[in-house]
Structures are given as C-alpha cells and as structure tokens.
Amino acid sequence: MTGRARARARGRARGQETAQLVGSTASQQPGYIQPRPQPPPAEGELFGRGRQRGTAGGTAKSQGLQISAGFQELSLAERGGRRRDFHDLGVNTRQNLDHVKESKTGSSGIIVRLSTNHFRLTSRPQWALYQYHIDYNPLMEARRLRSALLFQHEDLIGKCHAFDGTILFLPKRLQQKVTEVFSKTRNGEDVRITITLTNELPPTSPTCLQFYNIIFRRLLKIMNLQQIGRNYYNPNDPIDIPSHRLVIWPGFTTSILQYENSIMLCTDVSHKVLRSETVLDFMFNFYHQTEEHKFQEQVSKELIGLVVLTKYNNKTYRVDDIDWDQNPKSTFKKADGSEVSFLEYYRKQYNQEITDLKQPVLVSQPKRRRGPGGTLPGPAMLIPELCYLTGLTDKMRNDFNVMKDLAVHTRLTPEQRQREVGRLIDYIHKNDNVQRELRDWGLSFDSNLLSFSGRILQTEKIHQGGKTFDYNPQFADWSKETRGAPLISVKPLDNWLLIYTRRNYEAANSLIQNLFKVTPAMGMQMRKAIMIEVDDRTEAYLRVLQQKVTADTQIVVCLLSSNRKDKYDAIKKYLCTDCPTPSQCVVARTLGKQQTVMAIATKIALQMNCKMGGELWRVDIPLKLVMIVGIDCYHDMTAGRRSIAGFVASINEGMTRWFSRCIFQDRGQELVDGLKVCLQAALRAWNSCNEYMPSRIIVYRDGVGDGQLKTLVNYEVPQFLDCLKSIGRGYNPRLTVIVVKKRVNTRFFAQSGGRLQNPLPGTVIDVEVTRPEWYDFFIVSQAVRSGSVSPTHYNVIYDNSGLKPDHIQRLTYKLCHIYYNWPGVIRVPAPCQYAHKLAFLVGQSIHREPNLSLSNRLYYL
C-alpha cells in the first residue's frame, strides 16, 4: 500500500437560498418510522486521492444470497429490517422530573468559551417532508421490483426520493392526496400503483431525524466512504505502519439529532485499525507455536470474540465459533434452492480465489432479527483466508513502540481534530454531487463549529491523614503533593506472604527493602514477609497457596516472571473464591528500573493497604447520609458472552469504604437482573458500619448500551424502588439514578488566544449540545498529556431528591477524585470505575462469584 494520499476537493461551493435553523423548537413525539432509502443515485469523486484498492468484481451484486449475512436470504445493511434505536429517541425522562422541567442548568463555576464538533442543520423556509404509502395491485413481493415499477414514474415523483419498498419520502407534495399510476413488468403484466399521502412531517419530528441520518449516510457514500459498523472510512487513503504489520483507515463518526435549540450534525474523527495478516495467516503462525493436539482448542480461545473484516465487501463480523468439519469445498443451499460450494461462490460473487482448501470455516452469529418479532437469520460462514484481523492484541497494547507509532496518527490534538472534521464539512460544501443531493432535499449545514459557554467547577481539596492539599488543575493529579503523607486509615502488615521464583529472588528482596522505605511515611507498620520460592509453573504457585495461606494471612504478594494470563487467572481464582485472601500480583520486570522502583513500591504499598481494608484520601462532600452506588457490566467471551455486572456501594459518610457484589447474567444481556439482592446487602453493610440507614441513594449506572435507555427506565429503576419498599415500613430514602456514558462522539475545545485547547478538568456543559427531553450534562473531569480529552455524559433518568443541578454536577465531579488506584482525577465517578474493575476481574480471570467474605474490601484493584 502507498502512504497516505492528500485529500483534494473539486467543484465550487454553491450559493444557498435564505435558510432557517432546523429544530429551533424542541417538540418531540415518542415513536417514529424508520425511513430506508435507495442507494445514492450517482457516484461522486473519491474522498481522498489515489486508486481504489478493491479487488476486481468486489462490487458484484448478490444473486439472491449474501454469504456474509447468512445463507437464507438477502440482507441489505442500510435498508434491511428494523434497526435498534441507538440514540434512544422518544425516551423523555425530563417530563417526569418536576424540579428541572423549567431549567436543568447549573450556575456555579467560572464561565469559559467553548466550541464543539457540532454543525447546525438548516433548511429552506416552510420545509416539510412528505410521507407516502405505496400499494401494488397485484401485490409485488420483491422490493427491487417494487422500486423499479415505481421509478418508471420519476416524471411524477421526481428524481429526489427515498423508498424502502412500502414507504416513500419526497421533498414535495403531489397534487392529489391519492394518486394512481400504472406500470408494466418485464413480462408485460399491468400493475396499478396507489400513492397515498399519509404524513406531512415538520423538521423536528423523530421520523425526520431518522431521515436526516440516512440522507447523510447517502452523502458519505457519494464521497466514496465505506461503511464499517456504524462509522464510515476511507480505504483509499490508508495509513500504513509496516513495522507492526498494521494499517489504519481514517474515517468519521456521524449522527444528526435534536439538541437543545436546533438539530445538528455531530461528527468526529475515527480510525479503523486493521492488521496486515489474515485469520489464516494467524492460524498458521499459531500452529507453529503450540502443541498439535491442543491447536484447535487453543486457537479457538484466541479467535473467538475477535472482530474480523472481509475486504471484499468491507463488513465486520465477530467470530463466535470455528466449524472444523467444514472447509472451502463444503456446500450450502442458496436462496433459490441450488447448492454451491464456498470455493465457487466466492469466485463468482466476489472474484476471490481461495487457495487453502483444508482451512475450517468461521461462524458469526447474527445480532439483529428480521423485522419486528422476526426470526434470527442463519449464521454468517466466513473463510479465514478472506478475513482480516482488526484491532489490537493484548500483546500489542502492552508494546510501547506499537502504541507510540499508532498514537502519532490517531491521537489528535484539538486543532488537528478540528482540521480533520473541517475537511469533511469542506467536502460537503464543495462536492457538486453532494450539494445537488442536499439542494434537492432543501437542506444544508453550517460551515463552522458550534460555539457556546461552559463552566469550570472549583478545584477540590484533597484530605490525606491530617493534611490538606491543593493540586494543579492543569494536570489533575496529586502524586507529588501527597508523597510521604500519612494515609487516612492503615492496616498493619504483620502476616503476609511473598511468593517468587528463583530467578526473581533479587527482585523479591528489592521489593521488600523498598516497601520498608516507603511504608513508614504512610503510617503503615510492616513486618518482613514470609518468603517462599516456587518453580515457575502455575501448578507450583497453586500448591504453595494451598499449603501456606491460612486464616491469619492478611495478603499474598506473587512476584511473576511474566504477565501470562493463565497463571494470573489461576492465582486470582483461588484467592478470590476457594481461599478468600487479598492478593497482589507484580511482574518482576517492573521492579528492574532503579529510577522508578521507589514510585512502584509506593503504588504497591497503597494497593496492598486498600485491599486489606485501609483508606487513602478523601474530598469534602457536604451531602450527608448518602450512599453512592456504581454499576458496570462486562461481557465474558469465554462463557458464551455471559455478562457480569459489578455492583459497588459506599458504606461510610466519607465514601472511603466500599461494599461490592457481582451478578451473572444471560448471554449478551446488558441490563442488570437481581439488583434487589445487591442493594439489600449493601444497605445491611451500611447499617452495620453506621448503625443507621442512608436517607439518600444515588446510583451511577455505567455500561448501558446504546438504545437501552427505555429498558433501563422501565425495568431497572422499578427494581430499585421495589427494593427500597421491601426494606421496612417507614424507610423511604430519596433515590437518584444517573446513566454514565463514556463512549460519546462529542468533543469540546477551549478557545484561548486564537487557538483550540483541551478544556480544563472540571469543565461542565449543560447547554446547547444536551438533549431537551433529558436532564443531562457533560463533565470533562480528567487531564490528558496528549491528544484530545474525552468528556463523559451524565443523564439523570430518575430523581426524587430535589437536589439542584449544581449539586448533582459538583457531587459527580467530586466522586471522580476518590479512585484509589490513581492519585488524580479520573474520567468517571470512582464507584463506576470500581464496578468496572470488579466486573473485569470476574469476567477475565475468575469466571465465578467471588467469596462474599471479601465484599467490604477493594480486593479487585
């Protein structure tokens, strides 16, 4: 592949008639119809320069079957089936929150000028979208035939239209409410087509929002961007990193939504990381690294759960299984009933020659059903030789050089990000075909980033032991300020084990010596560990643990020669379930650098203290009698994508002690079941610690997938309310439930001296880019050393507390300061990160519920 080509636009920007902002009134109605248009009417110029790298025949049309979408029937990604509502349209939670109906904005903090990656959508005056229902007599089943028959009358409906086989959208109103026309099939059969006007839709209707997004996807296709998942990428402008066998496709995320005062396009830079090796290449390499009789089992563990890209159609699939009984010569039944081999199918359909005839077949299960209440289509059967691995392995993520070389291209500064986003908007304004499409629909986009004002909250004071510290808000960490200061609460280290291998004896002694140096300043009393040498085998570690760990053992430290997952998992599983004891695993090489060994020993000592029940630092929290709950989910790929929900709750006023439980859920289920059990246990733990009950409970719910908000409101919140009613007569605490979302495409830039910079930590945004039907806000809480900072979105879906928006926002920011694995401000409230760590440990390593005797400790850090 060649290096990255420079983008070039042709054509002149066309003048626009006087336009009005779309969505300047924020009236939304629940429920909408999903419009599904035809493909773009014409090809535009390439977005980016350079020759196309698709294979010959790669754009061939399917003859009744698309193998990558299952074998039973054709599946069209843009127009097929009923889509999940990823943006939770129609979920209006603010209407039930009386105290924020009039205003949901706060006022505390210093005003700061910001801009964001949003562009207003404008339309010509009195714009409307006209929706028609199309009937055929006699009935025509095939959607393509329906389209061909209708489009014989483009002189009536015009060339600008969107049609899904039943519903037609036009930018104009036909003369008659009901119009009848006649068409002929190729066989000469007469067909009567009845076109009935069913809706005249205003610009802000939910149906129009869906329509805008589909039209915008059409524009991206005109610019020759390829859809992969939900985003669009430019395969003709690749960034090649040959030293690591990686390729990056640059692209964009896009969505058009109703925000506070207008409908806007939100677009951000996205990068798709591909590997230069196919799945078959990976299997061959892996075969030479493993024992032959274990190959199938081991390679399945490596591949299942990974996402692959099929370049012949630029689609991605998750590998759910490997069918070792099939190979390219195996046959399957096509939609027309005929049988064909994989070999022949790929040759005819995509001009792809398969060379290895003994390779197995990858299986990818579909996620979406066909239509409302429909059945799942058959699995996609994929050939390893034609599938490219995407993303990074754990080994790559831990390789400093790989991540550094990737970051050069993917970690963009605010100004670089604005420039790339601006490049897309420039193309939209300069591409003749794109402008023609927009002009026909009567739509256009602003050229400039949206600007508005945000607020910077007051910097928090950190209390550690008897001392109080300020920190530099620009860096948002206090590792230097608190070094050498006593902790809030310490546990004496009297009875502990240090297990090491012979070659790590020096590192083990060095660790103990440095722990003796750093612990006195923390206030920790420490005795020398019981040191035990073991062979560097998993079984040897387990045997020593079984023989040496007793009820009096406070903590076990294992010094490991490498970060081998199987060894780590076995140690954690035994000490978290069979023999509940806090544990700390340390890779020996991290102790090898003399210049950092003291800092690492300090961090290890802090973690050990936390895991034994100690407390490090706190911030001022004016709210009293309040329990904070954090919930997050992890999908365990090794157990059929079973989900684990981590549940963490504060059990003291200072929010320095935490109770934890986890819940196992069915395959792919995101929303938590069994919340009652967790909350009841947490309230018992609170009562045991304080001898009274909390009067407020504030839940931060992370790990909610796009489109699941309605289920959360209707299903999970009632579980909390039912649980509180069951505690006892007369107990009626105030409840607040806040959905936390890290994966957002919104970016904010601070304007300083004519340059764009990252906003300072503590920046709150609750205007312009929030949703009118929600009680929501953004906070930029952390600082980043390079690239662009990502905000976190908070959506208060239930609240009978009566707390002001300022109080909720400031509490949320305070909670980002008390995560004990990092002496600084993190991106989400600490209970969310604790819940994530718990769910991750259980899903990655333990695969069972941890022993309940560990519930009151941060053993999962």
UniProtKB/Swiss-Prot annotation:
Disease linked to the protein: Defects in PIWIL1 may be a cause of a disorder resulting in the absence of sperm (azoospermia) in the semen, leading to male infertility. Male sterility can be caused by defects in ubiquitination and degradation during late spermatogenesis.
Family annotation (SUPFAM superfamilies): PAZ domain, Ribonuclease H-like
Principal location listed in the UniProt entry: cytoplasm
Motif (D-box): 217-224
Enzyme active site: 632, 670, 702, 836
Tissue specificity as recorded in UniProt: Expressed in spermatocytes and spermatids. Also detected in prostate cancer (at protein level). Detected in most fetal and adult tissues. Expressed in testes, specifically in germline cells; detected in spermatocytes and spermatids during spermatogenesis. Increased expression in testicular tumors originating from embryonic germ cells with retention of germ cells phenotype. No expression in testicular tumors of somatic origin, such as Sertoli cell and Leydig cell tumors. Overexpressed in gastric cancer cells.
Domain PAZ: 278-391
Subcellular location: Cytoplasm
Single Gene Ontology BP annotation: primary piRNA processing
Family classification: Belongs to the argonaute family. Piwi subfamily.
Organism of this sequence: Homo sapiens
Comment field on protein domains: The PAZ domain specifically recognizes binds the 2'-O-methylated 3'-end of piRNAs. The MID region is required for recognition of uridine in the first position of piRNAs (g1U preference, also named 1U-bias).
Site features described as Required for binding 2'-O-methylated 3'-end of piRNAs, chain residue numbers: 381
GO terms for cellular component: chromatoid body; cytoplasm; dense body; nucleus; P granule
Post-translational modification Symmetric dimethylarginine, affected residues: 14, 53
Reported modifications of this chain: Arginine methylation by PRMT5 is required for the interaction with Tudor domain-containing protein (TDRD1, TDRKH/TDRD2, RNF17/TDRD4, TDRD6, TDRD7 and TDRD9) and subsequent localization to the meiotic nuage, also named P granule.
Name under which the protein is recorded: Piwi-like protein 1
Region spans: Disordered: 1-64
E.C. designation(s): 3.1.26.-
Region called MID region, residue ranges: 479-615
